[in-house]
A protein has these predicted regions:
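Acidic, Ser/Thr-rich peripheral helices and adjacent loops at domain boundaries
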Residues: 111-124, 201-211
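Acidic, polar low-complexity linker/tail segments
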Residues: 2-61, 68-74, 90-92
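Solvent-exposed loop/turn segments at secondary-structure junctions
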Residues: 66, 103-106, 160-163, 188-191, ...
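C-terminal "exit" segments of structured domains
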Residues: 204, 208-254
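Short, structured coil segments at secondary-structure junctions
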Residues: 178, 196, 203-204
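Charged helix-capping and loop-helix junction motifs
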Residues: 167-171
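Von Willebrand factor
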Residues: 53-111, 115-157, 161-166, 188-198
């Protein structure tokens, strides 16, 4: 794992979303029926964006909040990450880089891997630790990697924002200008976090969906959809027959 440079925003840190696990357990479960609708919209939007370089191997940055309250979600993500590779046909390829933050200013990126077992080994050896969000570092790293070689999709999974939303929106806008879409998964129902995540998705021409641990099949479908987009663009995503995959098309601008 490679450490990422960066620093805390100090007085610019703005608390958004209760990261206390008890509070999230009692108030952070999406309404039944709402998740399916969000999944449908998310999948529809993804397929509306055409990849400019579908002839090359797709590259997907898989970023997760690994602070203490996120351990259950991290465990679920570990079990579901292989679904991303199942969406890729034999003639195509997908490279994934794991990026996570936790603790006091710790933000690390893995090497790029092209196999589910390699990614699983990287994720299994990591535990969650208390700390504030570092989404700004995620966006900055995505821009750096995108400058080296195009990233076709950034996936971010989190439940809170403890940084300046305006500063994050500016960084998201920079990624949008570079045609680097972010697909944001929100656990919980904090309306302020949702509004910010949706704005980041809009600015980058990406998409937003809820991350519902009680619906692993829908989450798997979402991951497959984004992976299909990253490796083959809109055409490969259209081949995905699942409802979530088709619904993701609706959000992405043409």
């Amino acid at each position: 794992m490679l450490p990422l440079a960066g620093h805390a925003h100090g007085t610019h840190i703005v608390a958004m979303g209760n990261k206390d696990p008890i509070a999230r357990t009692t108030g952070g479960v999406p309404r039944q029926g709402k998740v399916s609708a969000d999944v449908a919209a998310f999948v529809s939007k993804v397929a509306a964006v055409a990849r400019p370089d579908a002839a090359q191997d797709g590259r997907l940055l898989f970023a997760l909040d690994a602070t203490m309250s996120r351990q259950p979600t991290w465990d679920l993500a570990c079990s579901l990450q292989a679904e991303m590779f199942k969406a890729i046909p034999e003639e195509a390829a997908l490279q994934v880089q794991l990026l996570y933050f936790r603790g006091f200013g710790e933000c690390r990126a893995s090497k790029w891997v092209a196999d589910a077992s390699d990614l699983a080994r990287l994720m299994t050896g990591i535990d969650c630790r208390g700390g504030n969000t570092q989404i700004g570092k995620v966006f900055a790293h995505a821009r750096t990697e995108h400058g080296k070689r195009r990233i076709n999709a950034v996936v971010y999974v989190g439940d809170a924002i403890e940084e300046s939303v305006d500063e994050l929106a500016e960084k998201a806008g920079q990624l949008g200008l570079l045609n680097c879409p972010i697909f944001l998964f929100q656990e919980g129902r904090d309306s302020r976090v949702e509004a910010a995540f949706r704005d980041f998705a809009r600015l980058t021409k990406g998409a937003y969906a809820r991350f519902d641990a009680s619906a692993p099949q829908e989450l798997a479908a979402l991951l497959r959809a984004v992976a299909a987009y990253a490796s083959g663009g809109r055409d490969l995503l259209k081949v995905q027959g699942s409802g979530p995959a088709q619904a993701l098309l609706a959000q992405l601008p043409r």
